[in-house]
From Swiss-Prot:
Protein name listed in UniProt: Haloalkane dehalogenase
Molecular function per GO: haloalkane dehalogenase activity
Complexes and interactors: Monomer.
Annotated InterPro entries: AB_hydrolase_1 (IPR000073), AB_hydrolase_fold (IPR029058), Epox_hydrolase-like (IPR000639), Haloalkane_dehalogenase_1 (IPR023489)
UniProt KW Zinc keyword: no
Alphabetically ordered keywords of this record: Hydrolase
Catalytic activity: 1-haloalkane + H2O = a halide anion + a primary alcohol + H(+)
Length: 301
């Protein structure tokens, strides 16, 4: 497996990003070593909050949430998925599979040894993060699900996702910062959009971002359907808190909160919310997200 690594200087002087990088090496099934980046802020004895980003962002998406969690006494951990941020990037699009993403982040989770964690997941952060919850339920104390899902090939794609799938596979240059701006209600600054572009010096670094939309198991023929069905079985017995926090302006995941509220025992009686924002709700409602997580932790500890 050929692996690219974004030069460190691409991440120097980013707006609102004072956090020191931390790294874990994981081994792929083919023997390739991959370096995964994460941010780890706050007291070691604070409640660990795992903040998982999705397509095509990186941990920078949580820059306005991390300090709020730390100020509340919690520990904030935000990894970059393989192919994104400061994590290593396989150069061949075919090297990115749903199963591999789950395996890579499973190895990372075991290496950092999170226990009693509270997961906040959005977009592919949910498709991967919820699989981690299903595989390691003993490591998690609660979950907040936002603008994501755990698809099993049934139902129709939203028009928003169809358009995104078509665009992502055909556009000559994938405009990462532009996409983050378009998926947020507020207008991102030029510096913020540049920070989202930073992990990708050129198109060769974007194979993971190109591949993610095609990996979503929207049909029964997609890889990952059986594994997601098995994960749902675990979630259908999950009695720890699960809160939905979808946004009011995301055409891609509209209505996605319903199965979580209906099928997960731990979702009953929880203070589910609809947040103001687009697909990247972390950009639009960071204070509300941090407050929601703080409340969840204080209720359940």
């Amino acid at each position: 497996m050929q692996v690219l690594r974004t030069p460190d200087e691409r991440f120097e002087g980013l707006a609102d990003w004072p956090f020191a990088p931390k790294y874990v090496q994981v081994k792929d099934a083919d023997g390739t070593l991959l370096r995964i980046h994460h941010v780890d802020e706050g007291p070691r004895d604070g409640a660990p909050v795992l903040l998982m980003h999705g397509e095509p962002s990186w941990a920078y998406l949580y820059r306005h949430i991390i300090p709020r969690l730390v100020a509340a006494g919690h520990r904030a951990i935000a990894p970059d998925l393989v192919g994104f941020g400061r994590s290593d990037k396989p150069a061949d699009r075919g090297d990115y599979t749903y199963a591999r993403h789950v395996a890579w982040m499973s190895a990372w989770l075991e290496a950092v040894d999170l226990r009693g964690a509270y997961l906040f997941c959005q977009d592919w952060g949910g498709l991967i993060g919820l699989r981690l919850v299903a595989a390691y339920p003993e490591r998690f104390a609660g979950v907040v699900v936002s603008n994501t899902g755990l698809p099993v090939g049934g139902g129709a794609m939203t028009d928003g996702f169809k358009a995104w799938l078509q665009f992502s596979q055909t556009v000559p240059e994938l405009p990462i910062g532009f996409l983050l701006n378009g998926g947020s209600v507020r207008e991102l600054s030029a510096a913020e959009m540049a920070a989202y572009d930073a992990p990708f010096p050129d198109e060769s670094y974007k194979e993971g971002a190109r591949q993610f939309p095609a990996l979503v198991p929207v049909t029964s023929e997609h890889a990952g359907v059986a594994e997601n069905q098995a994960a749902w079985k675990v979630l259908e017995a999950w009695d720890k808190p699960l809160v939905t926090a979808f946004s009011d302006g995301d055409p891609i995941t509209k209505g996605g909160e319903v199965p979580f509220r209906e099928r997960v025992p731990g979702a009953r009686g929880q203070p589910h919310v609809t947040l103001h924002g687009g697909h990247f709700v972390q950009e639009d409602s960071p204070a509300e997200i941090a407050g929601l997580l703080d409340g969840l932790i204080r209720r359940s500890r």
